[in-house]
Amino acid sequence: MRTAEERTFATQDGVELFYRHWPAVAGKAARALVLFHRGHEHSGRLQHIVDELNLPGYAMFAWDARGHGRSPGARGDSPSFATSVKDVDRFIRHVARAHGIALENIGVIAQSVGAVLVSTWAHDYAPRVRCLVLAAPAFKVRLYVPFARAGLALLYRLRGNFFVNSYVKAKFLTHDPERIRSYENDPLITRAISVRMLLALYDAAERVVADAQAIRLPVQLLISGSDWVVDVGAQHAFFEGLGSSVKDKQVLPGFFHDTLGEQDRAQALGRMRDFIERRFSENAPPPSLLEAHHEGYTKDEEARLARRLPLLSPKNLVFAMTRFSMRTLGRLSEGIRLGLGTGFDSGSTLDYVYRNRASGWTPLGKLIDRNYLDSLGWRGIRVRKLHLEQAIAAAARRLRASGRPVRIADIAAGHGRYVLEALDRLEVKPESILLRDYSDLNVSAGSALIAEKRLEGLARFVKGDAFDEESVARIEPRPSVAIVSGLYELFPDNAAVLASLRGLGRAVAPGDYLIYTGQPWHPQLELIARTLTSHRAQQAWVMRRRTQAEIDELARHAGFEKLEQWTDDWGIFTVSLAARL
């Protein structure tokens, strides 16, 4: 039996999570497998996988998730599902950094709820690990009480977070008597799960299954043939939707939910071993996404959204009523009126959303405006602002730690509010701030904001085209923190985005930083396309989504390597910090 070393790593919010490290049997390993346990369990219950997988040349790692095993936190809870997904990213990066193993030489094995966390991470963060093995992912937990999910959601809205206990007995997880006995007697088993996490698990799983094509890593999916805990239909749908060029599905007849702890698990472990060894013997990168604006599923989606709906179709009539109400009663709302005038994707609208102060004609107008500002997309935008401020602070800390100056430049700043308000997070003020935008209106409003905040000696605002490679490359002073936020999401053409990024690659010195944003998913894409207008001559605001894998590849092509990422709770907006190579 391989012996584990016990360690901890720090999460983004400073929590120390427990993990086990099983070193390779002989010498220092250049390859690793990272294991993620089922819901309610902990890393100690994965020892048998480490031993029975029979891969002695691989270092192996497994954590105790927040609120599980020997990690801190309320049992079965986390601040949010997205926080736990971020924990996955931090753990994998910790393994790579602390143990000297390249991300490309790490494989990931995950079960049940752990497999949903890992699938969401693969979708939202586009990690460049070698492969994923997902066993019985809990994409759709069976709740046998009618309307249980809706009832839990209502109670959660009324009373806040609370806990429910798992109804699943060990005998429905596995046929293995020893695994049943150990489950029933293990004091570290967590029976409870918070309703916050349970509801978020459903939401994340539905999103990832619906948009599985964004996942392009090699994936092996193990499905238990007699699973009473989760609905396997969602697992089959996920597999069919995967964008991976290498994917393998194994259905194991008679297996209960604990696929890797079943009595006949040698079948599953053997297939896993073969898949993992094949993936590590190959090193074929996935097909490039640089031409995704010409072909691919997000291009097809964009084309569908740009097509007119049949005039009398129910969907078109609903959208027509929405447009009519916005252009009539909606004008009582200051935010809607501003969007109709300048475009709902304009810098002026963005600044209004950041300020988040409902305004309108009459109390009804204020009420409409509050509802408008509280729409999911705008809530996500405000979280993105906070993440931008965190990314700027993180870049500044790295620069200060190495004795380098902090010089900030944002090439499409809108009104520049998020950059100027990020100064409150910085321990030391930067040497300079340069804000640029193509719009005279934004330059004027941003300059006024600089004056309002009395930052004239530190910051200046100039007109500039973020897609002009030469203009961007000649930015002075040369930035050590370059920012491009909310711009590339509005333009589908990768050639234009690459020109902008190449300019930034020339402007930013090796070792300095770029902060860029993405929008890999949005639940309201069709509503936006059918009802809102853009800043471009009042055309319909039709967006082509870029998956996180696509925007990361564009950044790498321009010479940047992602170091860290922030994602909101809904998986809509991302902020990435990258270093110039």
Segments (PLM) and residue ranges:
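Conserved alpha/beta-hydrolase
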Residues: 50-73
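Short beta-strand/loop motif that positions the catalytic acidic residue
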Residues: 215, 221-223, 227
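A short glycine-rich, Lys/Arg-flanked "PGG" loop and its adjoining helix->strand segment in the class I
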Residues: 498-510
